[in-house]
């Protein structure tokens, strides 16, 4: 079994694809139910009110509303607060 491959061969040339992680909807933005808010590995952000967590720790909106980032018990949380409908006079 040769371990030297020859003159025009290389052991390099492999790389993995980017995972495209990060915050997808920022604080104050409107979201619809089901929209992804944060893609993450582990729980860097925790789900708050109106936010669900997928099997790969992705946070998504459970209802329509505004995205809010905050803290609860020393943890960074993401909430979705419902938008108040304008009142007709």
Curated annotation (Swiss-Prot):
- Is the keyword Ribonucleoprotein in the record? yes
Could you tell me which species this protein originates from?
Cutibacterium acnes (strain DSM 16379 / KPA171202)
- Which cellular components does GO assign to this protein? cytosolic large ribosomal subunit
Query: Could you identify this protein by its name?
Result: Large ribosomal subunit protein bL27
Tell me which domain of life the UniProt entry assigns to the organism this sequence originates from: Bacteria
Region (Disordered), start-end ranges? 1-22
SUPFAM superfamilies according to UniProt: Ribosomal L27 protein-like (SSF110324)
**Gene Ontology terms: biological process:** translation
Which intervals carry biased composition (Polar residues)? 7-19
S-S pairs: none
Q: Does the keyword DNA repair apply?
A: no
Q: Which family does it belong to?
A: Belongs to the bacterial ribosomal protein bL27 family.
Q: Name one GO molecular function term.
A: structural constituent of ribosome
The alphabetical list of record keywords is: Ribonucleoprotein, Ribosomal protein
């Amino acid at each position: 079994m040769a371990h030297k491959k020859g003159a025009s061969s290389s052991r390099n040339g492999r790389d993995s694809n980017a995972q495209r992680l990060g915050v997808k909807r920022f604080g104050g933005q409107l979201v619809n139910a089901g929209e992804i808010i944060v893609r993450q590995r582990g729980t860097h952000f925790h789900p708050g009110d109106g936010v669900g967590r997928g099997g790969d720790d992705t946070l998504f909106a459970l209802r329509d509303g505004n995205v809010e980032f905050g803290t609860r018990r020393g943890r960074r949380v993401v909430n979705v607060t419902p938008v108040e409908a304008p009142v007709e006079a």
